[in-house]
Amino acid sequence: MSGHSKWHNIQKTKGAADAKRSAAFTKIAKEIIVAVKEGGGSGDPANNSRLATVIAKAKAVNMPNDNIKRTIDKALGAGNTENFEAVTYEGYGPGGVAVIVDALTDNRQRTAPEVRHAFDKCNGNLGAQGCVSWSFDRKGVIVIDNEDQELDEDTVMMDALEAGAADFEADGMVMEVRCEPDDFNTVVKALEDKGYTFLSADIAMVPQNYISLTDEGDLKNMQKLIDMLEDNDDVQNVWH
């Protein structure tokens, strides 16, 4: 089983948005630098699809355009010597919840023990590469804010499908749009042009199945594990 609660994952985005915004900006800035370098040194999102994806993610958390531009300029600068390596860790949290951790690090010897410590501390188990990734699908995921309940579900669904989305679900204050990764930037732009406000927009690892944690100890440990991992400066994403 892959995750512990689908809508918990989405609703949690709202609660954490303000408290962790500064940390999110720092982590996204790191992703922008990597995207520019791995995109052949291009700072133009029209010619660098990975950069376009990261910019969509940045805008969803209200990262100011000046910050985005400044980070791109920094990545393009001849004096920029920052080198980050993408590393993925996989394991199981309390109750058998599958967890994937994406990191960008300049020192594997620092990051790996810290990630392992988080799993051990929270009654989890860091596993081998591939131990849980088979139970996730890589998808574009866009979460639309409907806190004021003013959006019409059918209208949003039609707009999303016309934009190229593959799936749509709604639950109270949020609506989730899914698409294939190759369609992500097109769908994001189409929905932005319609005036929708995003809570998050990212290429995500989506669990194929979800489980419910009923034990209070498991619930507390799972939340603690997520918090410990997300508070780590090297960790970019925690999928569960």
Q: What is each stretch, according to the model?
A:
Residues 1-127, 132-141, 240:
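N-terminal cationic and glycine-rich segments that engage phosphates or anionic surfaces
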Residues 141-240:
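Positively charged, low-complexity, intrinsically disordered RNA-binding extensions
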